[in-house]
Amino acid sequence: MLENMRISIQGIWSHKMRSFLTMLGIIIGIASIIAIVSAIKGTSEQIKEDLIGAGNNTVSVSLNYGDSEYDPEYGMSDGTAPPLLSDQQKEDIKNLDHVQNATFFYSRTYSSSVYYENTSFQGGSIYGIDANYLSTCGYMVQSGRGFVQKDYDNMRKVALVDSNAADNLFSGENPVGKTIEIGSEPFTVIGVVQQSDNYQPNIKTIDEFNEYYQMIMGTVMIPNKCWPMAFQFDEPENAVVKADSTDNMSSVGSAAADVMNQGIDTNSSKYKYKADDIMQQGRNMQKLSESSK
């Protein structure tokens, strides 16, 4: 044993340059592997951050008609009625594994039906939200107050605006206490809200630009019980589901869509609830990143 070690040491010493180059190659190889793994991990974390808004862990589930997202403002030319969700389905979603919270909401995008005096709320969004929406989506009240249960029970015509909508509609005025018109109905602004993170998306496509444009124009929110006053009865709702971790977002979104599709014959009906495809968004981002190099 000792003799073998002595011979090995003599061999290394007699071929110092070759031994040095061999060790250098091994060191460079190990360092390269570490660098590649670190880069992949960093890219994966960036993709996760792009997809979820830096830690919100929420996934949207939207009603589709055929290959397109359903737009309640225009309906469908074939006259078929969209499916409606129930409170029981919401509770079933909340009870799914890895779900922390869930919310149903009505929505109109690029809304032109909201006014403050002579100012139109062009390009923003209006949501009819339930009591879970603000906490699920990470909103905090900046001024005034949020919705309380009596606002829902008594169908009070009150509204919340986010900070972007406050800037665009009120031009520096304090919006709390002001009256805005939504679908020809007066609503009193009771609070200003803002999402707790200051996430700025990494815009790479026109769809991402449109989404970001709506975000910077702002959002107006009213209690979901008041939605029929401003818009229509029996409009379909979409959902936001909060997972307990980023790794469970895809499975949670898929499971929630299955619950929401209960009662819909998805083989014959063109209506179907679909969750955001988190993995496909990740693959698209990777391709865009690679093509831009």
Predicted regions and their residues:
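Hydrophobic, regular-secondary-structure patches
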Residues: K41-S125, N132-S135, K150, N168, ...
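Short helix-coil transition/hinge motifs at the ends and kinks of transmembrane helices
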Residues: S68-G79, N198-Q214, D265-K274, I278-S292
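"Rare, low-scoring activations can occur
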Residues: G218-K293
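N-terminal Sec/SRP start-transfer signal
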Residues: M1-I30
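Hydrophobic secondary-structure segments that place a key small or acidic residue at a functional site
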Residues: R108, T119-E235
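Alpha-helical transmembrane segments
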Residues: G29-I40
